[in-house]
Amino acid sequence: NQIWLAENLKYKCSGSYSYKDNKSNDENYGRLYTYYALAKACPKGWHVPSDAEWKELAYYAKEHKDSNGTGTSLKANHSCWECDNNTPLGTNQFGFSAWAAGYKDSLTFYFDQGYGAYFWSTTEDSDDSDRACVWSLKYDKEALFSNFESKFCATSVRCIKD
């Protein structure tokens, strides 16, 4: 019963970045946002998902996926993902269409375009208030992962309908 945006946000605001400062990346990959930009990122009627909402998506995808892994079913079937003979291409089974937009670390370095998709949740780390939960897909993995990252990192954002 969730409705997700089917592309990464492209809204330019304070705390958002173009991958490697190249604005031509924004059209397909969207912008990368720090945790502190999340409050103003989503359009009216939408919000950045919590960890619980990401878990609900992951559970649904796991229960309804085809023979591929959960992560593979959420990845775009597109050349934005690096592949080799051992890596399944995304199937976009659920229309989530995750692009491998990469991320910006808490300093000034950019990583993983073509290799990973990273998405904020609003859930903070209960042990470290400077960190929050990020969900990720990797080019060579069929799963959907979560871990805590610095709030100064910049990742893609997907919004979910209120």
Question: Where are the model-predicted features located?
Answer:
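Conserved positions within compact, well-structured domain cores
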Residues: 2-162
